Amino acid sequence: ADQCSGLQGFLVFHSFGGGTGSGFTSLLMERLSVEYSKKSKLEFSVYPDRQVSTAVVEPYNSILTTHTTLEHSDCSFMVDNEAIYDICNRNLDIERPTYTNLNRLIGQIVSSVTASLRFNGALNVDLIEFQTNLVPYPRIHFPLTTYARIISAEKAYHEQLSVPEITNACFEFSNQMVKCDPRRGKYMACCLLYRGDVVPKDVNAAIAAIKTRRSIQFVDWCPTGFKVGINYQPPTVVPGGDLAKVQRAVCMLSNTTAIAEAWARLDHKFDLMYAKRAFVHWYVGEGMEEGEFSEAREDLAALEKDYEEVGRNSADGGEFEE
């Protein structure tokens, strides 16, 4: 970092469920806060799968790392293993996705988020702007990521989509990187990052059409809601890979109260195990105290409550504390 001429911040990639992804990342984020307190810290976090578990103690690790990193992270883009598996199955016809398939898909999102730092465009967005436009309160910093269009190389020759079509696709449940239902929540902010053959006129028309849809609800205290980035560099794919080379694509980062569903699922699993104090002795044996579990769980309960509060209309008297 000291060799950088214009350090904007840090991108940290980790999983919630594993010991290294949760434990080491928590320590790393704490250190970065001390050494580089003024720099942005953005996370790309892999959320545990609802069906397939790689470790029995995933709920513990997930709650503990979220609690520890909450004050050190400026923005955390969550990616759900189950959602990515489903996209590979459905959109790319991959029956048994490998980590390579999954990572290439995540790579497209990371590429979109960082494209404006690396290439020219009509409307560029830097790391600080993500926070400014997506994070209304410090703790509410877990945007939902959606990407369109994801199609296989075989289908690409007869399926090039227009700007309105890829924009609409961003609001479809099937293109989300986390399993939750935005129709049950409210949007606080949306950041649409376009790449390739895209002009502002088409984007404005697409957004105007989106705003007329009843199913997309914004909180009443943030009525405008859309931040746009346009980058002329078309999406790049790995030669010979499963993803098609397309003329244009969009990555949507949206801060929605629906993401609280993901926390509720994790909290429930944590509660089932912690009620029996199952596996806790392994953590205590490594130097942790049992009280840290209760503290982390209480913090996550507060986070769920925070999301509930911001989703209320101003008229409901929902008063939110930072």
Curated annotation (Swiss-Prot):
Record keywords, A-Z: Cytoplasm, Cytoskeleton, GTP-binding, Hydrolase, Microtubule, Nucleotide-binding
Record flagged with keyword GTP-binding: yes
Record PTM text: Some glutamate residues at the C-terminus are polyglycylated, resulting in polyglycine chains on the gamma-carboxyl group. Glycylation is mainly limited to tubulin incorporated into axonemes (cilia and flagella) whereas glutamylation is prevalent in neuronal cells, centrioles, axonemes, and the mitotic spindle. Both modifications can coexist on the same protein on adjacent residues, and lowering polyglycylation levels increases polyglutamylation, and reciprocally. The precise function of polyglycylation is still unclear. Some glutamate residues at the C-terminus are polyglutamylated, resulting in polyglutamate chains on the gamma-carboxyl group. Polyglutamylation plays a key role in microtubule severing by spastin (SPAST). SPAST preferentially recognizes and acts on microtubules decorated with short polyglutamate tails: severing activity by SPAST increases as the number of glutamates per tubulin rises from one to eight, but decreases beyond this glutamylation threshold.
Locations listed in the record: Cytoplasm, Cytoskeleton
Gene Ontology MF terms in the entry: GTP binding; hydrolase activity; structural constituent of cytoskeleton
Single GO biological process annotation from the record: microtubule cytoskeleton organization
Enzyme Commission no: 3.6.5.-
Entry-linked SUPFAM superfamilies: Tubulin C-terminal domain-like, Tubulin nucleotide-binding domain-like
GO CC list: cytoplasm; microtubule
Catalytic class of the enzyme: hydrolase
Superkingdom of origin organism: Eukaryota
Annotated binding of GTP, by residue: S15, G19, T20, T54, N81, N103
Signal peptide: none
Statement: the UniProt record of this protein carries the keyword GTP-binding: yes
Catalysed reactions listed for this entry: GTP + H2O = GDP + phosphate + H(+)
Active site positions: E129
Obligatory cofactor(s): Mg(2+)
Homology family: Belongs to the tubulin family.
Subunit structure: Dimer of alpha and beta chains. A typical microtubule is a hollow water-filled tube with an outer diameter of 25 nm and an inner diameter of 15 nM. Alpha-beta heterodimers associate head-to-tail to form protofilaments running lengthwise along the microtubule wall with the beta-tubulin subunit facing the microtubule plus end conferring a structural polarity. Microtubules usually have 13 protofilaments but different protofilament numbers can be found in some organisms and specialized cells.
PANTHER family named among the record's database cross-references: TUBULIN
Role noted for this protein: Tubulin is the major constituent of microtubules, a cylinder consisting of laterally associated linear protofilaments composed of alpha- and beta-tubulin heterodimers. Microtubules grow by the addition of GTP-tubulin dimers to the microtubule end, where a stabilizing cap forms. Below the cap, tubulin dimers are in GDP-bound state, owing to GTPase activity of alpha-tubulin.
Other remarks in the entry: This tubulin does not have a C-terminal tyrosine.
Protein name, per record: Tubulin alpha-3 chain
UniProt source species: Gallus gallus (Chicken)
Lineage, top ranks: Eukaryota, Metazoa, Chordata, Craniata, Vertebrata
